[in-house]
Swiss-Prot record:
Protein name: 3-methyl-2-oxobutanoate hydroxymethyltransferase
HAMAP family documented for this protein: PanB
Free-text function comment from the UniProt entry: Catalyzes the reversible reaction in which hydroxymethyl group from 5,10-methylenetetrahydrofolate is transferred onto alpha-ketoisovalerate to form ketopantoate.
UniProt organism field: Neisseria gonorrhoeae (strain ATCC 700825 / FA 1090)
Gene Ontology molecular function: 3-methyl-2-oxobutanoate hydroxymethyltransferase activity; magnesium ion binding
Functional pathway: Cofactor biosynthesis; (R)-pantothenate biosynthesis; (R)-pantoate from 3-methyl-2-oxobutanoate: step 1/2
Length: 263
């Protein structure tokens, strides 16, 4: 079974970590069998599964339900579950209560969004036995504050994002996930922090990659993000598409130049 120690060893060895979102048992089993290292039960289910316009309406009850479903299907992969909007920002104690529910539902790690200001919560959780994935850069729960889905950390804002990563790393984060960050900045973060980094729209030099399942299968309606590749194209089955994704991440051929944001 993949553990926090496994991810650290993969970073040290230069082996790419493959993460993919999963929301139910059948796809979890398929992805696990295809070699996906980490299954992310993302609050992206609000948009991909529930048909909402953002991740904000997703509840802790929703996240626990889908975590339980994924846990029934996965045998080897690590399961990371999102703390949903409103379930952890009020206090460290609130975050622990929500994280404990997700861990009881089958998660091996929880993911929270936010920079330096959330590092104290990261430390609070990890000191109480809950591994944390810290999500920085474009944080979808703050989409309305950002004014839309925009690349983060460009120009004069690069140092602030680096500080976010360092703060979480020093607080004991098990993983730092970067979304929509210039490739050179993501590379610098990866070289700076001791924990593994996972990227989505953050270049090819992160320690691993993640995509939303619906995006990589080409079944999400609407405009496709720059960092997305449709792995279903040219494949005869979903499992073949997932295996192709795993193979390209491991071979360091995905993401390619067309999927990367410049400074």
């Amino acid at each position: 079974m993949i553990t926090v120690n496994t991810l650290q060893k993969m970073k040290a060895a230069g082996e790419k970590i493959v993460m993919l979102t999963a929301y139910e048992s059948s796809f979890a089993a398929l992805m696990d069998d295809a070699g996906v290292d980490v299954l992310l039960v993302g609050d992206s289910l609000g948009m991909a599964v529930q048909g909402r316009q953002s991740t904000l309406p997703v509840s802790l009850r929703d996240m626990c339900y889908h975590t339980e479903c994924v846990a029934r299907g996965a045998k080897n992969a690590m399961i990371v579950s999102d703390l949903p909007f409103g379930a952890y920002q009020q206090s460290k104690e609130q975050a622990f209560a929500a994280a404990a529910e997700l861990m009881a539902a089958g998660a091996h790690m929880v993911k929270l969004e936010g920079g330096v200001w959330m590092a104290e919560t990261t430390e609070f959780l990890q000191m109480r036995g809950i591994p944390v994935c810290a999500h920085i850069g474009l944080t979808p729960q703050s989409v309305f504050a950002f004014g839309g889905y925009k690349v983060q950390g460009r120009g004069g804002k690069a140092q602030a994002l680096l500080n976010d990563a360092k703060a979480h790393d020093e607080a004991g984060a098990a993983v730092v996930l970067m979304e929509c960050v210039p490739a050179e900045l993501a590379k610098k973060v990866t070289e700076t922090v001791s924990c593994p980094t996972i990227g989505i729209g953050a270049g090819a030099d992160c320690d691993g990659q993640v995509l939303v399942m619906h995006d990589m299968l080409g079944i999400f309606p609407g405009k496709t993000a720059k960092f997305v590749k449709n792995f279903m194209r040219g494949q005869s089955s979903i499992q073949a598409a997932v295996r192709a994704y795993v193979a390209e991440v491991k071979a360091k051929t995905f993401p390619a130049a067309e999927h990367i944001f410049a400074d």
